[in-house]
Amino acid sequence: SPRSPSNGSSRTLSVGEMYLFDTGGQYLDGTTDITRTVHWGWVSGCSPPAHPRHAPKEAYTRVLMGNIDLSRLVFPSSTAGGTVEAFARRALWDAGLNYGHGTGHGIGNFLSVHEWPVGFQSNNVPLEAGMFTSIEPGYYRDGEFGIRIEDIVLVVEAQTEKPFLTFEVVSLVPYDRKLIDLSLLSPEQIRYLNSYYEKIRAHVGPELRRQRLEEAYEWLQESTEP
């Protein structure tokens, strides 16, 4: 389910399943919102006879592909979010899958985590440089598993001759490598992923070293290998 469980429905986690955590915080200089899905143990492959909807690894990879496809998109200025929203769903649609929540929402500055009117719904305002929004495709199987990958992005001007826009991802947390089926990713998606990991290393690595968090630093290096 895309919603948090109640105290009455919570149960003990096991190493044989995925865990989705949607987290964030309010700070004087901004608000954060991020979702990662991880697997505690060994992940089985996604080869037949399992359909993608019963194969968590393939489903996760398709959600990640949607996140990447929308995050790296270049689009004309004044484009409405609802116009490009399908890029986040395309990889899932290719397998006959979908999700039942919005693809993203505006982020407040020490205000609402979900802030109107920025986002990817049909009634949101056109995207403009300087706006922050989330990109968070997902996939859910009630009683089995849930997947969501959420990053916060800044709308910026693209390096094009005409007035176009693109997104700059400001969430710097690696994805779970065990859940990624590289055979499904295009060369462009792999290049994007490697570039994103280089950015995480460059920005987060030195801070972990400064705080002498060596175990966290080693985890970061391992999690961001090309």
What does each model-identified segment do?
Residues 1-226:
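Active-site neighborhoods and metal-handling regions in enzymes and metal-associated proteins
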